[in-house]
Structures are given as C-alpha cells and as structure tokens.
Amino acid sequence: MFAQPFDHAFNDLFSQYVDMDSSMVDGNKDVSIPSDFDQIFSLDSLSSDCGDHSPPVPTKPTHQSPQPWATDLWSLPQDAASSASQCSFTFQDTVHPSAVSDLSFHLEAPPTSHPVPAVTCKASSRSPSTPPATPHHKSTKSALVTPKSIRRHRDSHERKLLRKQSFSPSLMRPSQLQAGRMMYPEAWAQRFQNFSLHSSGEHLPLSPPPSDILVQHENTPADNVVTHMNHSTEGLSRNPAEMPSHYETGIFNQSPAISMPSPSAKLLAQQQQHNYLSQSNNSTMATSSPPSGDDIFSSPHSSDPQSLSSWHSDSLGGSALPFTPELQAHDGQAWWPSMPSRVPRQPSYQHVVSSPAPQRSIQSNNQHDLMQGGLMIQFDSSFDGSTSADPSFSSVVTSAPMPQENQNMYSHIPVTPQKYMNLSAYATPPVQHTSRSPSLSPRGRGSPTQGSPLRNEASTKTSPHRRGYHGRKLSSQSMNTPKPVKGPNSSSPGSGSNKSLTVSFVNFTPNDSKKILTGVAPSGSSKTKARREQEARDRRRKLSEAAINAVRKAGGDVEALEAVLC
C-alpha cells in the first residue's frame, strides 16, 4: 500500500510553506502573476465582491459600486474565452511564498491580499458548469485547501468547525445570491470546458509538499494522521460539480437552474484524487503503523456538511473512499494484517475474557475452527483466536462485576450456542446454594447449644426459609419420635395405670382407633383440668381433717362426722 519510496527533494519546498510570517505577506502585496486571466476577470469587480480584500495591484482605494459577478462574466468578449482555453498556469517548484500564503485569505488578517490568477484558476477549474453563485462558494473552499490552513489547524475537530463555518449561508451575501443567477448554463459550460481540460493537471496542490519534517514534528499518533488525511481528502478530492445538488435545498435554493456535471469535471476530480493519493502515500511512510481497517472506512461525522455527499454520490465510488484504489486490488492483504496492531490496545478485554485458565484452550480452538471455516478469510500466524473476539462481546463480559462461576459461564458466549445452554444448566445449583446458605447457618449453630431435639426443631420453625424446605422432614421426625402416652385413668391419683406406649403412625378412622390406639395424649386443657381437680380434692381433704380435729377436741361423735363427710 505504501510501495513508493520517500523522496527528500520536497523538503526545501516544504520549508517555504512553513517558514513565512505576516510581515513577508504584507510586504509583498504588489506581487502578482501575469497571465491571460486579467482579461477574463476584472480586478476591481473581483475585489469588490469577494470581501474586504485589497486589490493585488497597488492602486488608490476608490469606492466602486458592488456589481454582481455574473454581469462581469457574461460581458466577456469571445477572445477572452479562447485565451482562457490556451492558459497554462504552471506551479513551479520555486514559487514565492506570498503567492501561496495569500490564498488562505479567510484564515489570515483582512488586509492580506490574494493574487487574482491563482484564485480564479482554482475557482474556474473546479466549477466549470456550476451557477455563478458557486464561485463564491468555491473561492472559500480554496482557502481551506492551502497548506497554511492545514498546517495551522491540525486538529480534526477544529478543521471541521471551520469547514462548516465557511459553508454557512451567513458568510454569503443574499444580494449577491440574488444578482448571481445563472441565465445561460450551457454557455458557461461550453466556455470553460477546454480551460478545465488544460489546467486540470497544473493546479495548485491540495496539500503541502510531502516532507519528513511534518512527520517528525507531528505529535499526534498514527491513527490521527490517517483520519486527518481521510477527512481532508473526503472534503477536497470530491467531484466539485456534485456540490450544487447537495446544497440546492438549503443554500442555493434561489438559483433557478442546476446544470448536470460534465465529463471534464469528473476527469478533473479523478486526476486530483490520484495526485493527492500519491502525495499522501509518500508522506505517511515514516509513520509507526499502517492505517487500520476502521480508520480507512471511517464513517462521516454528523457535523460535517458534506456527509450526505459521501454516502449518496455514485454508489460509494472513488470520490467517497480515498484509499479505494489500493484496497480493491489488495482486499485481504490490506485489511486483515492491520488487525494485530489493533489487538494489543485492548488488554483489559483480552484478560477478562480469557481469565479462566482451564477453559482458555477450548475457547481458542473453537474460535480458530469457527473463523477459519469460511466466516473470516485470512489470519496472521501470530494472531491469537482468543483475542479476535469482537470488543462488543468483550464489553458485555466486562460490563458488570460478576462472581467467578458466572464469569466462566459468560466467557463461552462468543464461541458456540451449545456452550451457553450447558453452562446455564450448570450454573443454576450455585445460585440456589447461595440463597440457601443463610438459612442453613442457624441450624449448625443451634445444635450444640440446645439440648433436646424437640426444642431445636421448634427454634428452626421460626425461620421463614426453613419452613418451606424442611416442613416434611420435621413432620416425619415428630411422628417417628417415641412419646409417653397416658392412660384414660391418669387423672385419679391412686390409679397407677400409667403406661408408655410407642405409636408409629396416626390413623383417624374410628375402627382403627379402637384396634390400635389405647390412649390419647394429654392436651393443654386436660392438664389444666386435672390440676384444678387435684387442688379441689386437696382442699376438701384439708377441710375435712380440720373439722374432725375440732369435733374430737370438743368431745363430740367423730365417727358420725366422718360418715357424713366421706
């Protein structure tokens, strides 16, 4: 992809782009390149319409009435168009710095000037068949093409903001839009068709000359350099004749006629694209790593005003993807070997997914079999299968802190769906074990301290968790334990008929109660009743004894009294 060797002959030309200041620009206002464009575009009308810029030829500042650009263009003589077709505006290797730096007049101070032939050659060559309102639009676009503007605004975010600001309708006067309506689009396309063919290979370069100085002094990483060139080529190497169709509803809705793009404009855009690709491939030779796949196929940002044109123009042709001519020839070789450079940048995802040691080999073998089976084509020999999992799957694994057994379960999700079913069935007992563990702990503590098993079971009945799990177990223990059963005559003190019977089970049918049961266990109410009856008998006995003693002391008949009391 970067097969061309780097040439150090551009360093002197690059130093001329870099080493210039505003004093040199201001001191060379009278520098102008003479050509045949002086006959096409008059200097006074251009200086009065393009903004607050002084004319390049030092004249006295006379106030002239602003005239629309279209009136100057349509009043051209026929020999001016013929001389424009024979124009040869070549870019020498030793161009004066002010002639190049003055092109960025929207980013410099207002008193700076711009040479008329350079600007008009850029505007007319890039828009041969567009409305006259578009040359304002294209002249502002050429300011962003200049090397100084790219050198000053290396941040991609600031460059997108400047590009968005330069295309806003507030910078264009509505009176000029009203006055600049195109009346004869066929005549415009016919006049400048020959000129665009002559000057297509001789325009100013879209970027500063490729130099290793820029790569050495660049502090941004390699991915930002690639995205820097992608955004610059996305906005600059596009077909310039397609611009009115993208902005016709918002900005240029006042122009009545939109002309179709001519074949010369498409040829011009392709030549510009190939020239820029050759320069950008040379300038990125000294970078540390090749551009990765997601940087090459970068999606357009929503803040970019040309995002619509990159996806809706000519079914994603060469103008939308700047690195397409290299990638179509070497698809697999350019896409997959760049992936291992992206893999070590995500060590946290890799270690979390592959953290369980016994399951690491299974996961890597399954992923090698899966991805070499036809889903993914080419891999490097040092490319590990466990690290090739997509970061979206890894972010699902690392999204929430989870225990070790759950982590073992989720680490097999990107491999096969059968692993997920087996491990989900495997992971259900530990979940139940963790829910049962708080209820099992009081039983282990209470067994040595509490003496009788009945009191232990009564204490565990109070726990809400144990009632559901151990209700059947407690009922079987209560029926199997031997209990003392009192006979029916247990209320009488002197009966002596207390027996201990072992009852194995209880059946509530009347016939079985006659055959099996010999007594009923005393309940709480029967115990209270027996105690009260015993107290009443003791009270009557004490009273009778006291009465007998009193009668005996008095000398009465004791036998007759005992017969009455007993």
Curated annotation (Swiss-Prot):
Induction per the UniProt record: Highly expressed during conidiation. Expression is positively regulated by hsp90. Expression is also controlled by upstream regulators calA and crzA. Expression is decreased by 2',4'-Dihydroxychalcone (2',4'-DHC).
Domain of life, source organism: Eukaryota
Sequence ranges of Low complexity compositional bias: 298-316, 435-448, 482-500
Region (Disordered): 116-174, 232-316, 334-364, 381-400, 429-542
A Gene Ontology biological process term: regulation of transcription by RNA polymerase II
InterPro entries: WetA
Basic residues compositional bias, start-end: 463-473
Biased composition, class Polar residues, residue ranges: 165-174, 269-291, 347-364, 381-398, 449-462, 501-511
UniProt note: phenotype after gene disruption: Causes the formation of defective spore walls and a lack of trehalose biogenesis, leading to a rapid loss of spore viability and reduced tolerance to various stresses. Also leads to delayed germtube formation and reduced hyphal branching.
Keyword field: Activator, Conidiation, Sporulation, Transcription, Transcription regulation
Function: BrlA, abaA and wetA are pivotal regulators of conidiophore development and conidium maturation. They act individually and together to regulate their own expression and that of numerous other sporulation-specific genes. Plays an essential role in the completion of conidial maturation and is essential for trehalose biogenesis in conidia. Negatively regulates expression of the melanin biosynthetic gene cluster. Also plays an a role in the early phase of fungal growth including proper hyphal branching.
Family: Belongs to the wetA family.
Protein's recorded name: Developmental regulatory protein wetA
UniProt source species: Aspergillus fumigatus (strain ATCC MYA-4609 / CBS 101355 / FGSC A1100 / Af293)
